[in-house]
Structures are given as C-alpha cells and as structure tokens.
Amino acid sequence: QMCIRDRSVSGAGKAPMDELVTQSKDFLEGKKISSKNFTKQIAFNLIPHIDEFVDEGYTKEEWKMINETKKILDPNIQISATCVRVPVMVSHSESINVEFEKPFDIKSVKNILNKSSGCKVIDERKDGGYITPLEAENSYLTFVSRIRKDSSNNKAINMWVVSDTLLKGAALNTCLLYT
C-alpha cells in the first residue's frame, strides 16, 4: 500500500558519504556548510527528494520503487512511495503499510516473516526492542520490527524494515528471488 523509504547516503555513492562526514564536522564546529552532492544540507537533516522530479510530483526514485515492487510482487498491487535521503551512512530503512484481503492474526504474520529466508524479526514492544540502520550494518539479513495492526484498518499492518544496502542491495535480492 504505502511505503516511506529512508535512503542512506551510501545509496548516492562515496562522495556523498564523504560530504556527510564533512558537513557533520562543519556543523559541530559552527562553520558554514556547503552542499555539492545534495540539494540541501544532509548533516542533521532529512531531504524528501531523491533523483529528479517527474510525473505527478513523484521523483524518479519513487517511480522506480513503485515499478520494481510491482515487477517483483504483483503488477496489480497498489502502492505509493515517498523516498527520503537521511543522514545515515549505510543502511536503508522503510516504514511500510500493507493491506491484506481479510483480517489476520499479527502472530501469524510475525511467524511467516521470521521463517522467510534472509529475514529476521526483532519486535519487542519496549524501548530498544527494534532494529536501527546502524545495527543492521554488516549483515546480509533484512530486519523487520515495529510490526503492528494499522489502527485505521483492521486488514492492514505497519512495520519497520531495515537492511545494509552495501551487502543486501538489489543485485543480491534478485539472486535470492531466483533461488
């Protein structure tokens, strides 16, 4: 249904990663910050814009995400996406809302996700009972946390998904799909 993808600076390459480090140092030292690889300052900031703007106010990155999801899962799936560049070095994360055809049991959803190859559920309902982008670094797993029923729709769930994009990017995911 809906996905907000938080993309780390590594998704843009090495120069943007270096820029995040430089901007962070400059910010903490009270220096003027310049942006070469981003449309705005990335250090201590979020940029709700990745790639160029195209149809209906979406960006190329958002359309790419929508089309890839349809290609992998189902061409008829209805999805909307917002992609945000975040001041995180490596891992991408997504806040996802999924609607099912009928009501479901949240425990069953967690069990199915936990049994999925390359997926690990870390979902404790307490402070720190979830995975963060930093904790997902250097792992080939995709972590799922904050799994809960959507309070506005009894056929939908919300969840938080994180993976190290340098290790588990599109190429590895494609290979896993074919195996």
Predicted regions located by residue number:
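Conserved small/polar residues in nucleotide/adenosyl-binding loops
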Residues: M2-D6, Y178-T179
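C-terminal substrate-binding/catalytic lobe of Rossmann-fold NAD(P)-dependent oxidoreductases
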Residues: R5-N158
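Generic C-terminus detector
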Residues: A156-L177
